[in-house]
Amino acid sequence: MGKKITDTSFAYAGTSTGAIIAAGLAEGYSAHDLFDLYKNNLKKIFTTYSWYKRLQPKCPTYDNTNLTKILKDKFKGKCGDWKKPVYIPTTCTNIQNVEKVWDLGDKDIDKWFAILSSTAAPTYFDCVYDKNNNCYIDGGMWKNCPIDVLNAGLMKSGWSNYKILNLDTGMTTPNNESGNKTLLGWAEYLFSHWIARTSYSGVYECKSILGDDSVFHASPYHQKKIKMDKTDNDTINQIVDIWTNYYYANRSKILEFMKL
């Protein structure tokens, strides 16, 4: 676009993988930096637990050790140290109010921990515990698309006259499920098609509050869902191509929206 996205934005929100993107932009990393971070570390992030550990019924598929090391290396300091507002949803399973959003007010929370807690997707990665033994899992359990969390945080802080660019990392895919299912089938459906998808309710809400012209929902269409743990080169290149084609097809609209 000719300018760094961090030069044209003042606040960020992201859940799960989006938490890394949002935190990275707030940290001052460029979009290219974050692309390289993902591309160079995807296979390390999705390191499968040994087969004998996975014999345990509650063992997730992937060991989060490498992800933790990467986050500790790239994100130093506390959440309160960020210079721009950041909102990172997570889910705390053993407190009364399970919906938690890390932000600048969490001055005693390490940045890396806030991000890791938002990425702890059930069945994929381990739960994450803080020093008080509070248990955290993926923020996508309740807010996979935190556009309304961002808007609420900004309004609460007194911001006005802003626009929101919403990047749908899950993309738009066909909804073709029908019929009754077994208990296990419904569980898989709810997890894959609801928890892991981008809910558009927040987009509708923000458009009704800010106006249609103040919200741009960027979401490429793809014929089928792509599992988040597919890290082969063909899949990575396919995703890059999908987003590249989407950008060039909508470039004029995006630049006009951002006034670049």
Predicted regions and their residues:
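Patatin-like phospholipase
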Residues: 1-260
